[in-house]
Amino acid sequence: IMSKCHYKNECAYFKMRNKLKEGNRYIRLNEYKPKVIIVNQDMLMMNFKKLTFGKESLIYDDPCMLIIDEVHNLEEKQRANMTKTINSKTVINKIKEGANRVGSRSRYLKNIKMIEDWFNLQKDSAKSEIYKNGNCLSTGRVDIKPVSHHQMAKLISMTKEIVEEFDVNNIAVFKQSSLVSNEQLEIANNLLTLFKNLQNNSDKYIFWTEITKQDQIDISFCPNNIAETLRKTVFSTSYPVVCLSATITNKTNNENSYEYIKEIIGFKGYEEDIKYNDFPYKESRLYIPPNLPKFDKRDVKYYEEIGKHIFELASQNKGGTLILFTAKDDIDGVYNDLSKRKFNKTIYVDDGSKSQNEIIESFKKTKGVILGTGVFWEGIDLKNELLTLLVIVRLPFPTIDPITKYKITKLNDSNEAVIVPEMIIKLKQGVGRLVRTKQDKGLLVLLDSRMNKPIYKHKEAVLDALPIKNMIHKDEVKDFLNNI
């Protein structure tokens, strides 16, 4: 598929793959052992996947050591690598194309209609679930709507008929080319596999549904044994593996600090070592305004109150401002409020119209205000006056989606055994945007009303996770921002 892409000559990923191939060829021919090879986690996971299936390695496969940075992302990267996703529009179109090629579309109209009806049922169910949760599901992943055993049996039977027809016509015997493409056959086979797994209520897979931006439906499924797969591949090599991240400890003392991350990536490890940086966090300040609007009341009044806090804080800030959200709808609500105010700052909205890099490059020129979510929680490196005010609107608890539900079940514990460690990891990632060098200092603001409660059960865990400990009151904010 990659070789057929019209944009392959401009694609950075394609160019990198080719360079790696050339590098591997040079290594083999010259018996040269490279000292350092840098790849992203997506490519690393794909490399281990290819090795598992006995295919040629993408990268040099006999290193002296593997160092994995930002290891808190490894589980999700491996899950993405093992996930099969079926798009409703693509499935229907490819099945229709294949049926047309073999002259059997009219014969399979009933089959195709039943498959379409099932996808529409999933879309309606997903939309209902999202709206029920205030349209604020951060991952967008919801459970698949079950159908009766009889209905699923019919779906399997009808899809199997299509697969068998495509399979026969995929083989070119007396013709120059097959009638049905490999892609059409693969898509039909993936759909059949999905239906069979759903029918068997397989406990080896996690299933979920997502609504796409084009109002289509994506059905995804992946093996649930992510930790076991990582243990057998990445962590069972003949060379040592070192895992790094600034955010994977979940306790202030050293005892069992890595317990959660080790559990979800299947890495038991032989040695643990917590290193502390010497950034001057004492020079920065933490501010939690009193009387914040209730965090779970996402109405016009809520966005007005949050918008007011952001407006007042950012207006006093001479450097750049980053506002981190946990849901796109919250960005929309706050932006609608800010756009009505006489704001002397340029606002950059993470609405998908521009890439993160495009937003960052424009932001550097104006020291404005970024309203961001998702990727803006990590990987941003804005030093000195480029970022002096960081506002976190809500504590970044993960959504209880099908994947989180499975993790909770696996740990045989309450929701909090999963959602609290994941919230702390995400929170640390976000807070880490503010102080990037020994010369940096800034103001960290939390706008989550739960932090106003003296007896909030996770308050101590949140405060312990923050490297910035010195709190200030409202009447100190202006002077602090003016003196940065």
Predicted regions and their residues:
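Extended, Lys/Arg-enriched charged tracts that mediate electrostatic binding to polyanionic substrates
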Residues: K35-Q41
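Conserved coupling segment at the C-terminus of the helicase ATP-binding
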Residues: I1-N18, E31, K35, F48-L66, ...
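Conserved RecA-like P-loop NTPase helicase motor core
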Residues: P290-V300, D351-N452
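N-terminal targeting/trafficking signals and adjacent low-complexity tails
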Residues: V445-I484
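Catalytic acidic motif of RecA-like/P-loop NTPases
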Residues: D42-M43, H72-N73, W377
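Phosphate-interacting basic helix/loop segments used at nucleotide- and nucleic-acid interfaces
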Residues: K15, L20-E22, T373
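Conserved RecA-like helicase motor-core motifs
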Residues: K268-D273, S339-I360
